[in-house]
């Protein structure tokens, strides 16, 4: 089983991933993105999908017109893990 993040690792997320926040209702991190239009939002989602495949770790997400919300959590760990951090950092590189 994949280990969950420790309390110290969670506390470090504020500095490590300043654009992400802890989800209110579950053990996950989330980030909201806004783009000029739907085409840009969908293009971003396509790039994230390819990245997620490379990481073998897939986000939960939603899209409404020019907005994309991404939520990361590791089901095998029952919450946040290092896999979520690595994918969030990679997604930040695309934004």
From Swiss-Prot:
- Give the catalysed reaction(s), semicolon-separated: (4aS,6R)-4a-hydroxy-L-erythro-5,6,7,8-tetrahydrobiopterin = (6R)-L-erythro-6,7-dihydrobiopterin + H2O
- Which family, according to the similarity comment? Belongs to the pterin-4-alpha-carbinolamine dehydratase family.
Q: Name one Pfam family in it.
A: Pterin_4a
GO BP terms, alphabetized: tetrahydrobiopterin biosynthetic process
- Keywords from the named record: Lyase
Gene Ontology molecular function = 4-alpha-hydroxytetrahydrobiopterin dehydratase activity
What domain of life is recorded for the organism?
A: Bacteria
Keyword set includes Ion transport: no
Which named protein is this? Putative pterin-4-alpha-carbinolamine dehydratase
Which EC numbers characterise this protein's activity in its record?
4.2.1.96
């Amino acid at each position: 089983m994949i280990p969950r993040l420790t309390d110290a690792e969670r506390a470090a997320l504020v500095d490590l991933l300043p654009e992400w926040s802890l989800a209110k209702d579950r053990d996950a991190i989330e980030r909201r993105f806004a783009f000029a239009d739907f085409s840009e939002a969908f293009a971003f989602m396509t790039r994230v999908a390819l990245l997620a495949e490379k990481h073998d770790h897939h986000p939960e997400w939603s899209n409404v017109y020019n907005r994309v919300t991404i939520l990361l959590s590791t089901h095998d760990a029952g919450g946040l893990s290092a896999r979520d951090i690595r994918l969030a950092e990679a997604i930040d590189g695309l934004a």
